[in-house]
């Protein structure tokens, strides 16, 4: 979901969402990083009223079909989900053996600094 062309109009409506990794980097080929996504989705289902009808984690993006029932709505879910998962994946890159550690951190960190939305 890049740019402002797609705005969440109804915070409690169903949406088909695609969340991509910058530069289409294949981060989710490693199970450890994929588990961050799955665990975060499960947490949001239990704690943030997320209702998922379908989801899939691909090598470099995630598709979700669902809604947030009440609470702060879809925008807040997306903000919190992306913030937590991106930080946790960056931590894991340092913690686990990663052959592309320097390259991954360089690409992902550079984009985070460049983004007008990221507040690090």
Locations of regions flagged by a protein language model:
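Short catalytic/metal-binding and nucleic-acid-binding patches
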Residues: 1-120
């Amino acid at each position: 979901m890049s740019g402002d062309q797609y705005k969440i109009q109804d915070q409690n409506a169903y949406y088909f969402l695609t969340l991509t990794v910058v530069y289409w980097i294949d981060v989710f080929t490693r199970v450890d990083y994929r588990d961050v996504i799955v665990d975060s989705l499960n947490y949001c289902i239990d704690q943030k009223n997320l209702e998922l009808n379908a989801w899939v984690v691909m090598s470099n993006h995630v598709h979700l079909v669902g809604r947030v029932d009440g609470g702060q709505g879809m925008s807040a879910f997306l903000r919190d989900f992306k913030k937590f998962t991106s930080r946790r994946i960056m931590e894991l890159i340092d913690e686990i053996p990663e052959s592309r550690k320097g390259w991954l951190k360089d690409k992902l960190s550079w984009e985070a600094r460049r983004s007008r939305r990221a507040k690090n």
